[in-house]
Amino acid sequence: MRVERELMRGAGPVAVLRLLEPGEMYGYELASALGTRTGGVLAMGHSTLYPLLYNLEAKKLIASRWRRAETNRRRRYYALTDRGRKRLAIQRDQWKALVGALTRIGVLPDTATVSLRMEPAR
């Protein structure tokens, strides 16, 4: 299932911040993780992901650096900043409140809150 653009605008940034919480990742790795770990629901193409990454970096929620991979190829790695960690904590609380509210009015089943936790990265 594909998510509508407006929902993706809200969920995309928090999903990227969460994936970067354990450690840095490069763009293709992030795109791949978004697709596989969300069952394709939050899959993003590069034309969506990279502007999102640049926006998060402009807000100082993530930082990037170039690094050589084992293949001697240069890759841009993204990492969560302290400011990004704080924002992620705030957004987690907001998403929990939103899911709770939608559950209370019957939009989501009561079991929806159980699946909020993501499995550990990597």
Residue ranges: model-predicted function:
Residues 2-6, 66-67:
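Short beta-strand/turn micro-motifs at beta-sheet edges
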Residues 4-50:
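N-terminal helix-turn-helix DNA-binding core of bacterial DNA-binding proteins
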Residues 35, 54, 58:
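Residue-level detection of the helix-turn-helix DNA-binding "recognition helix"
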Residues 57-74, 79:
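Beta-hairpin "wing" of winged helix-turn-helix
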Residues 80-84:
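Accessory beta->alpha helical hairpin/"wing" motif in late/C-terminal subdomains of nucleic-acid enzymes
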Residues 86-122:
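Amphipathic alpha-helical dimerization/coiled-coil segments
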